[in-house]
Amino acid sequence: MQVILAVIVWMASSVSSSSFTASTLPDITNEDFIKECVQVHNQLRSKVSPPARNMLYMSWDPKLAQIAKAWTKSCEFKHNPQLHSRIHPNFTALGENIWLGSLSIFSVSSAISAWYEEIKHYDFSTRKCRHVCGHYTQVVWADSYKLGCAVQLCPNGANFICDYGPAGNYPTWPYKQGATCSDCPKDDKCLNSLCINPRRDQVSRYYSVDYPDWPIYLRNRYTSLFLIAKSVLLLLSVIITIWVKHKYPNLVLLD
């Protein structure tokens, strides 16, 4: 799950006509953006080698996209420190992949494919990694079935983040090797080598709480400071009341 920092020199003559600009970067509600994020992930998950017998289909989650968007806006090129703090109503921990590169070369497909390309460093039989593999293993983590992505223009380039639920990258294999779909959960069907379930794959639209523009960890920090200060003031008021009653026993305190 390490951060990819892409330092790329790109000649103006090679910029694609489909490149994004600061004003055309897609929002997390953009249907084409959502479709591409989901489609590319599932295409890559369906072609893993060796084949997977328990690879779940990934579907979009608006809350994960909100969390990713809030963190991209911080322009802090490191993982969200709240990923294991149950910031999602359905998952105790989240996975996260980060891509940083020139806006002129950014595309959803190229960013996600760059994560998947880490497969060349990963030995499935031994789970050994020769370089960086965490982005690849999260993309193909069989039990991660929800994702939400966001992209933000930052001073150093385009910051593209995908968050996953439940989190992957535990000290075990990313998926079970075997005949495709031979170990899908009960009631699942097989489609393009992926385990699908309409109920599980339904896109929830009931989330109504939006994260503010400032980073999640700052919001939690300020909330904690407020609660601590409130507790300290309450304790001080109790101590002062006891001291006054002890010092002036005949004093009548008005409520």
Curated annotation (Swiss-Prot):
Protein family per UniProt: Belongs to the CRISP family.
PROSITE patterns reported for this sequence: CRISP_1
Main location: membrane
Keyword hit for Signal: yes
Domain SCP: 39-164
CC per GO annotation: extracellular region; membrane
Transmembrane parts of this sequence: 224-244
Keywords, ordered alphabetically: Membrane, Signal, Transmembrane, Transmembrane helix
UniProt-recorded name of the protein: Glioma pathogenesis-related protein 1
Membrane topology term: Single-pass membrane protein
Top-level taxon: Eukaryota
Keyword Transmembrane: yes
Compartments it resides in: Membrane
Signal peptide stretch: 1-17
